[in-house]
């Protein structure tokens, strides 16, 4: 039977109108039919493929966008997205989120120009205004705030924190005089903290997956979430068949049988929040049986053995700790992992060199997250997989030009001397530079002062933050709110002024890769089409706002626009005399051999040629990366990898020391942030995760996970992605709660029953799906649905699990405890 476009749409429309046996499936077909044709279908024209960088997730994948310039009206339209074969992260591949990027560009509910609130906050009443009026309004409010000596009360919250845009925002706050630059990417910062505490390098941790022989993952969904599903998927394929005659073994630790767990060689179910105990139990077996890399431990680490000065008491070392406290029997009782499994996995891990252990959000987002990740990294140190092939390394950065320092005038100096609203850098947050999870408490209490204004850059705390999601009235405590979102999300509804950004297919931006690989990779995002609406690059808006404020604030922004800042920063890369413009693998191999022989042969003579080649190929990278000798690899006080984290000294009454002699004693900390005292507080150790609620009243624990097709607020308005089931018992256009069949039978709940998931913090209504791939004491809810705003495709389906997540946090790492909340399940 021949199906025409008109017939297909008529058929799906009839099904939707009938509303019969198909139920919510009927809605799916109708919505997908409409969404497929929502974008403009271009007439005949001139085709071109333009490189850019995807922004649908943090992966930083290079893409090629097919455009068609109409011969009728001369308008260029983007019609398809594929992977860029030159980009080392994607190599011609792209995930479903990347393909759906067109739907961000063509979203019918995009904000089409500046808006001024004309009714009560949250009422949805807006007046369209021009850009001159909008910027004048923002300038007047900020100038008045500064004139009153309240510059420090300005708060900026950023959700996308790579590249020069967060640098620009932080620079604006510094010049203006506010210490309150806050990021919502707290969970992504924990690997940077682990690198800082163990190696003294404040960069994200990267992983040499392809060269590993054994990969042990703790709560890391490499194939569906994580840092870059495309890059990780390519690495996974290489582990399976990249080297003839060699197949790496992959073991996945998680309470839920995820896509990554199903594709691994072995899934190890575990109780939520106990990953650190398991890692230390594995370490016990490796150490007790002498399976560790004795040369690396002796020559490159500090704190493995007990240590201390001749005149002082002995200090506890990692070896004594794990041998005394983490026997497999004790660890099995904590984690639920059988003793035999603990012993076998430890022996496999130590025997298959190189081996790699890595942790993800499932292991990190608990109140014990930092110590858990330190314990996981200790496994890599035991087998010599730190700064080694097949192991971990610090992410290298591209050699961008360093921006000139900001001249702080008197108003800026006074403002920057004030404490932060989120408490970062002091007390319990002494080790972190941003603590977004603590911001609601500061707003609620008005301490240490009340906020005066709030800038929101790709941040949607009314959805992503448990505290804000339950209490959006907190925004009423802020007199003036500006959102730069291109979409009317949950938080933008409470703004006073909306200055909508371009979508990622309409703007210039740098995208340096982080926490994926290791070599420095700098992607260039460029506009592939003209802006469809009266939107403006947020970087341009910030520069114009700064220049309108005048004085020292304007001096800090000498660039005409954000593209001018990009070009100035990229000068450093062009002049570094290393690396290469992205190219085909065989070209890169030739240039790499030249570099190894001591030659660097550029493909450009001027900066303009360099810039044009970047735009033509998609970016720059350095396959070799800068050389890293031991002095560069370990920049700690001891000059070694530190099992005993001397960088935790700020938590104690006095910091521990390690100079030329790495056996100097440390002070026993009296830390309000951690239950442990004495030497244990400086070592990887297991602390039971703090969870709200009585175990008898709330006997289950909730874990949330990110399916491949959902990225919170970034992709909520893209129906192609909502149509993709997430694996397991999922269906499209639906959110659910997964229940182990044994647990469901005990509670009298059947598959597809309507149920309430309740916690001490709140409750959400969902459909129960029975799923045997789940620990019996655990419920699982996908994260990314349940939006109350964001447009017709984002709203009115699913539920936001953050409404039941408690308000606990890992105060040491400054991250919210989004996993392991105590809950109960009752029939609706």
Where are the model-predicted features located?
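Long, contiguous, secondary-structure-rich segments that constitute the structural scaffold
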Residues: 527-531, 538-597, 601-604, 657, ...
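N-terminal leader/propeptide and maturation segments of large enzyme subunits in energy/redox metabolism
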Residues: 117-133, 291-338, 528-642, 753
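N-terminal export/assembly segments and adjacent metallocofactor-ligating motifs
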Residues: 1-292, 313, 329, 338, ...
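Acidic/polar loop patches that form or flank catalytic/metal-binding clefts of enzymes
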Residues: 79, 292-295, 342, 356-357, ...
């Amino acid at each position: 039977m021949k199906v025409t476009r008109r017939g297909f749409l008529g058929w799906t429309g009839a099904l939707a109108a009938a509303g019969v046996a198909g139920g919510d499936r009927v809605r799916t077909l109708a919505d997908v039919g409409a969404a497929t044709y929502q974008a403009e279908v271009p007439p005949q024209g001139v085709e071109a493929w333009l490189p850019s960088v995807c922004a649908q997730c943090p992966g930083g994948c290079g893409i090629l966008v097919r455009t068609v310039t109409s011969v009728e009206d001369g308008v260029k339209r983007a019609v398809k997205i594929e992977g860029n074969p030159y980009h080392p992260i994607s190599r011609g591949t792209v995930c479903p989120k990347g393909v759906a990027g067109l739907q961000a560009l063509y979203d019918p509910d995009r904000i089409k120009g500046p808006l001024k609130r004309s009714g009560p906050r949250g009422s949805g009443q807006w007046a369209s205004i021009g850009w001159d009026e909008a910027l004048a309004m923002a300038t007047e409010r900020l100038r008045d705030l500064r004139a009153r000596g309240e510059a420090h009360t300005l708060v900026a919250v950023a959700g996308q924190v790579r590249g020069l845009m967060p640098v620009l925002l932080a620079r604006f706050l510094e010049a203006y005089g506010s210490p309150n630059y806050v990021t919502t990417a707290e969970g992504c910062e924990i690997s940077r903290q682990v690198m800082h505490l163990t190696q003294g390098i404040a960069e994200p941790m990267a992983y040499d997956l392809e060269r590993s022989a054994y990969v042990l993952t703790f709560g890391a969904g490499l194939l569906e979430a994580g840092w870059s599903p495309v890059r990780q998927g390519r690495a996974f394929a290489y582990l399976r068949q990249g080297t003839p005659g060699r197949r790496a073994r992959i073991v996945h630790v998680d309470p839920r049988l995820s896509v990554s767990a199903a594709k691994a060689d072995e899934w190890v179910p575990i109780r939520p929040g106990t990953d650190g105990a398991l890692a230390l139990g594995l370490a016990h077996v490796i150490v007790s049986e002498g399976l560790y890399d004795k040369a690396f431990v002796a020559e490159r680490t500090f704190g493995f053995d007990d240590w201390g000065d001749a005149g002082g008491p002995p200090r506890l070392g990692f070896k004594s700790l794990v041998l005394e406290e983490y026997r497999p029997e004790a660890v099995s009782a904590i984690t639920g992992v059988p003793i035999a499994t603990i012993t076998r996995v430890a022996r496999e891990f130590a025997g298959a060199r190189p081996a790699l252990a890595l942790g993800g959000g499932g292991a990190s987002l608990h109140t014990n997250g930092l110590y858990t990740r330190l314990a996981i990294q200790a496994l890599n140190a035991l087998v010599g997989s730190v700064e080694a092939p097949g192991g971990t390394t610090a992410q290298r950065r591209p050699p961008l030009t360093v921006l000139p320092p900001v001249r702080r005038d008197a108003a800026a100096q006074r403002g920057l001397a004030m404490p932060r609203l989120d408490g970062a850098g002091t007390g319990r947050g002494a080790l972190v530079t941003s603590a977004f999870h603590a911001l609601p408490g500061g707003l609620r209490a008005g301490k240490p002062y009340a906020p005066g204004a709030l800038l929101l850059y790709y941040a949607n705390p009314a959805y992503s933050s448990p505290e804000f999601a339950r209490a959006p009235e907190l925004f009423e405590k802020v007199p003036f709110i500006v959102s730069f979102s291109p979409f009317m999300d949950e938080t933008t509804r409470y703004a006073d002024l909306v200055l909508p950004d371009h979508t990622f297919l309409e703007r210039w931006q740098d995208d340096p890769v982080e926490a994926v690989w290791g070599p420095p990779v700098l992607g260039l995002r460029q506009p592939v089409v003209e802006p469809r609406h009266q939107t403006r690059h947020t970087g341009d808006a910030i520069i114009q706002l700064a220049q309108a404020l005048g004085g020292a604030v304007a001096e800090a922004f000498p660039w005409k626009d954000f593209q001018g800042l990009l070009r100035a920063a990229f000068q450093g890369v062009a002049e570094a005399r290393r690396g290469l413009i992205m190219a085909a693998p065989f070209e890169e191999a030739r240039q790499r051999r030249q570099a190894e022989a001591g030659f660097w042969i550029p493909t450009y003579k001027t900066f303009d040629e360099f810039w044009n080649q970047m735009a033509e190929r998609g970016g720059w990278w350095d396959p070799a990366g800068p050389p890293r000798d031991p002095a560069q690899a370990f920049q700690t006080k001891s000059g070694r990898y530190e099992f005993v984290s001397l960088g935790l000294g700020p938590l104690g009454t006095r910091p521990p020391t390690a100079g030329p002699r790495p056996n100097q004693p440390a002070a026993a900390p009296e830390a309000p942030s951690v239950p442990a005292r004495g030497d244990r507080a400086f070592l990887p150790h297991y602390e039971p995760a703090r969870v709200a609620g009585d175990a008898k009243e709330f006997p289950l624990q909730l874990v949330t996970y990110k399916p491949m097709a959902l990225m919170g607020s970034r992709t909520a308005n893209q129906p192609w992605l909502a149509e993709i089931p997430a694996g397991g018992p999922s269906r499209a256009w639906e959110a659910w709660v997964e229940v182990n069949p044994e647990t469901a039978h005990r509670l009298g709940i059947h598959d597809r029953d309507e149920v309430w998931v309740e916690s001490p913090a709140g409750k959400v209504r969902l459909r129960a799906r029975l799923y045997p791939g789940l620990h019996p004491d655990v419920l699982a809810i996908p994260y990314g649905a349940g939006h109350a705003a964001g447009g017709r495709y984002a709203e009115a389906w699913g539920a936001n699990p953050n409404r039941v997540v408690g308000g606990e946090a890992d105060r040491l790492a400054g991250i919210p405890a989004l996993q392991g909340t105590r809950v109960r399940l009752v029939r609706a």
